[in-house]
Swiss-Prot record:
Gene Ontology biological process terms in this record: lactate metabolic process; tricarboxylic acid cycle
GO molecular function: L-lactate dehydrogenase activity; L-malate dehydrogenase (NAD+) activity
Chain positions recorded as substrate binding sites: R83, R89, N121, R152
Active-site residues, as the UniProt record annotates them: H176 (proton acceptor)
Enzyme class: oxidoreductase
Keywords from the named record: NAD, Oxidoreductase, Tricarboxylic acid cycle
Name the UniProt record assigns to this protein: Malate dehydrogenase
InterPro entries: L-lactate/malate_DH, Lactate/malate_DH_C, Lactate/malate_DH_N, Lactate_DH/Glyco_Ohase_4_C, Malate_DH_type3, NAD(P)-bd_dom_sf
EC code(s) of this entry: 1.1.1.37
Organism, as annotated: Rhodopseudomonas palustris (strain BisA53)
Positions annotated to bind NAD(+): G10, S11, G12, Q13, I14, G15, D34, N96, I119, T120, N121
Catalytic reaction equation(s): (S)-malate + NAD(+) = oxaloacetate + NADH + H(+)
Length: 322
C-alpha cells in the first residue's frame, strides 16, 4: 500500500518539528514547502538522515513550488509571520491573509482532497480565510488550537495534583487567545470533575482560577521566556494528533477550530469546539449545553473571533467571492 503524503506548508520551527514527528510516527512521506529557498530542502535532508538511527522509513522532500503538494492526503499550514513588537493587529492580518490566499490557491489546485490543518495565527480568522481561499469542504479544513490549549490545561492540572497527565482530561472552548474558555466542570482527574476535587480539598477555587488564567496566557508565557519566537513542540504535537486521527480513522474527540453553521448559535465562523475527527474529516460537532458564566465567556470569545473575521472581510473582500 502506498504511503500517505503529508504536505507541510511553512518550514519554520513548527514545520521542522512536524516533519520529524511524521517520521517518528510513520504517518507517511513528507513534503516540506517554503518560499525561502534551501530551508525546506535542508531540513528535509537533515530529518531524513535521522531515519536510519530511529528506524523509520519515509521519504522527505523540500520544495519551493506548490506543485510539490500534488496528491497530498494532509496539508498542515504554518506559513505566515508572527506578530512583532509595534505591529498592529490589522498589519498582521493583512500580511497573513495574503499568505492564506496564496496557500489556499496552491491547495485548491494540487491537493483538493486533502484534510487541511491551519496553525497560522490569528488562528480562528486565518482558518476561516484559508477555507474561503481553497474552497475545500468545511469538514476538511480545521484549525489547531483547542488540542494545544487543552494540553496546556492538562499539564498544569497534572502538575498541581501530582498525577499522570494521562489521567487528566480537560475541556477548552472558544477562540485561540486570551478569551478562550477552559471549562472547569467538564475537566476531570480519573473521571472526577475539578469542582469535586476542590470539595475534596485537593486544591482551592482560587488556585484553580490561577491555573485557568495561566492556560489562557500559555502561549504568551512561552513567547516571553523564549524572546526569539513562540512555542513549537506542543503546537506541532497537537496538529499531529489531529492528522493521525484523520489518517487512521481513529474518531478521536478533540477540540479544534471548526466551522459552525448554527451550532452553539454561531454562523459562518470557525470557533474552538469539540469534534470527532475520522476518515471523513470533521464527522460530528459535539454541542454541549452552556449556561451562566460559561455561556457568557463563550459568547465573549466568539465576539473576539467575529471582530477578527470582520477585519479580514474589510482587508480582503475578494475572499467573500472566492
Amino acid at each position: 500500500m502506498a504511503r500517505d503524503k503529508i504536505a507541510l506548508i511553512g518550514s519554520g520551527q513548527i514545520g521542522g518539528t512536524l516533519a520529524h514527528l511524521v517520521g517518528l510516527k510513520e504517518l507517511g512521506d513528507v513534503v516540506m514547502f517554503d518560499i525561502a529557498e534551501g530551508i525546506p530542502q535542508g531540513k528535509a535532508l537533515d530529518i531524513a538522515q535521522s531515519s536510519p538511527v530511529d528506524g523509520f522509513d519515509a521519504k522527505f522532500t523540500g520544495a519551493n513550488s506548490y506543485e510539490a503538494l500534488d496528491g497530498a492526503s494532509v496539508c498542515i499550514v504554518t506559513a505566515g509571520v508572527p506578530r512583532k513588537p509595534g505591529m498592529s493587529r490589522d498589519d498582521l492580518l493583512s500580511i497573513n491573509l495574503k499568505v492564506m490566499e496564496q496557500v489556499g490557491a496552491g491547495i485548491k489546485k494540487y491537493a483538493p482532497n486533502a484534510f487541511v490543518i491551519c496553525i497560522t495565527n490569528p488562528l480562528d480568522a486565518m482558518v476561516w480565510a484559508l477555507q474561503k481561499a481553497c474552497g475545500l469542504p468545511h469538514n476538511k479544513v480545521v484549525g489547531m488550537a483547542g488540542v494545544l490549549d487543552s494540553a496546556r490545561f492538562r499539564y498544569f492540572l497534572a502538575d498541581e495534583f501530582n498525577v499522570s497527565v494521562e489521567d487528566v482530561t480537560a475541556f477548552v472552548l472558544g477562540g485561540h487567545g486570551d478569551t478562550m474558555v477552559p471549562l472547569v466542570k467538564y475537566s476531570t482527574v480519573a473521571g472526577i470533575p475539578l469542582p469535586d476535587l476542590v470539595k475534596m480539598g485537593w486544591t482551592s477555587q482560587a488556585r484553580l482560577d490561577e491555573i485557568v488564567d495561566r492556560t489562557r496566557n500559555g502561549g504568551a508565557e512561552i513567547v516571553n521566556l523564549l524572546k526569539t519566537g513562540s512555542a513549537f513542540y506542543a503546537p506541532a504535537t497537537s496538529a499531529i494528533a489531529m492528522a493521525e486521527s484523520y489518517l487512521r480513522d481513529k474518531k478521536r474527540v478533540v477540540p479544534v477550530a471548526a466551522y459552525l453553521n448554527g451550532e452553539y448559535g454561531v454562523k459562518d465562523m470557525y470557533v474552538g469546539v469539540p469534534v470527532v475527527i475520522g476518515a471523513k474529516g470533521v464527522e460530528r460537532i459535539v454541542e454541549i449545553e452552556l449556561a451562566g458564566k460559561d455561556r457568557e465567556a463563550f459568547d465573549k470569545s466568539v465576539g473576539a473571533v467575529q471582530g477578527l473575521v470582520e477585519a479580514c472581510k474589510k482587508i480582503a473582500p475578494e475572499l467573500l467571492g472566492a
